[in-house]
Amino acid sequence: MSRAHGSPRSFFPVGNPFRVMFPGGAHLSRKLQELLASYEDALALSLRKLKPEAASDVLTLSWMRLAVDCLSELHTNIANLITDLELPVSDWDDKWVDIYLNSSVKLLDICIALSSELSRLDQGQLLLQYALHVLGSESGVPSQEQLKRAEPSLREWMELVGVRCARLVSCSATLQELAGNLSLMKVKNSAKGKVLMRALYGIESVTVFVCSIFVAVLSGSPKPLVELHVPEKFGWSQAFNDLHTAVSEELTRQLSGGSVAAVKELEEVEACARRLHVLASTSQLEEEAANLANAVSHTEEEVMSDSIAQEGDHHCGLKLADDTTREGGIVISESIAEGGTQEAEMKKDISYEKEVAMVERISYKEHQDSNVKQANGSSDESALVVPERTSVQESKEELLNCISSMSKSAEGLRHGLDSLSKRVGDFFQIVLTGRDALLCNLRISDAASKVAEVSS
């Protein structure tokens, strides 16, 4: 049946989708429809921006900065929406106020915990900077003394990043509570109230999920991640559910190992720090081994001197014994023979150890020399010292590369932490400002009500 001539055309040619979104015959004006559609389109766009090309990118500080920027934008949008709705606080239901105030105060607590953890990690940069300063050398290669001085700072930094923040652990329960309380509240007799509740449901869902990612990554545990599924009746549901599925699966897989340092930039610095710590510890052990060898050598020399002195005493005793009795001379001779045997065995052992060491060194040089000859086709005498120089050179290059890598990684980590901390602080101020504005309007509304009661 054709439409009657002159009848008004529907704004939606295929029917009004808001009848599905708001069952029960609720009607929205065209202005409210446009406001809600604009808000939810922006929400869906932000969610699509947050979906990384690789799911593991959520473990980076750069993705976390992008996520905080999106949250700040969304919370600014909700404040603008409330203004555009022209819905005074005096018309708000008490339940709406309770929901907003309760969720906002918990969100502020989470922001404080995140800021505290970022500040703690940033303070650890002092230890890294000191270690890098100590390892700096005009010749390029740090000495064993420099490695020894840097080792305690590296160890202390690794202990610092290996500790789980108690505040972040408590955030897990808060996030689960917020996720459990998420629901689209039914609103009667207020089209503006329905739009407001729908918008608040969207922003709370996204905020809780993103914050759970932050807490999970910084704590190195998948437990804080919340399980949410947005119904299809919301225009941004597809973008949210796609992001949730991809990120949750990847984080659960990555964090199941229990590694505390889950942030990629932090892991890069930690890998370099551990390698430098091993090199510094090895250098210290080599120094202690050298000191021990010197002490053993000194002890052997003293034993040899005592043995020689005892031998002289035995000879004197032998002469005296010959002047008295032959029997005493025989006893002393046996003593001399025994002492001489012990001395010979001691010299033999020392000589044997030196010979073994020399044979091993010669064998090693011959083996390396053979390899050099095969590679170069030369029997030059200088080839004999190439293996030793190559080994030393490789160790120096490894050490310098490790220091260079840690310096670059530490600088990237510092900039990343500073930038993320600033963004979290800005987001905190946005949430706090919105909360304060609501409380201020509530006080004004209450005061106006009291004045009206007195006047009447």
UniProtKB/Swiss-Prot annotation:
<comment type="similarity">
    <text>Belongs to the ROH1 family.</text>
</comment>
<dbReference type="GO" id="GO:0016020">
    <property type="term" value="C:membrane"/>
</dbReference>
<feature type="compositionally biased region" description="Polar residues">
    <location>
        <begin position="371"/>
        <end position="381"/>
    </location>
</feature>
<protein>
    <recommendedName>
        <fullName>UPF0496 protein 4</fullName>
    </recommendedName>
</protein>
<feature type="transmembrane region" description="Helical">
    <location>
        <begin position="195"/>
        <end position="217"/>
    </location>
</feature>
<dbReference type="Pfam" id="PF05633">
    <property type="entry name" value="ROH1-like"/>
</dbReference>
<dbReference type="InterPro" id="IPR008511">
    <property type="entry name" value="ROH1-like"/>
</dbReference>
<keyword id="KW-1133">Transmembrane helix</keyword>
<keyword id="KW-0812">Transmembrane</keyword>
<feature type="region of interest" description="Disordered">
    <location>
        <begin position="368"/>
        <end position="390"/>
    </location>
</feature>
<keyword id="KW-0472">Membrane</keyword>
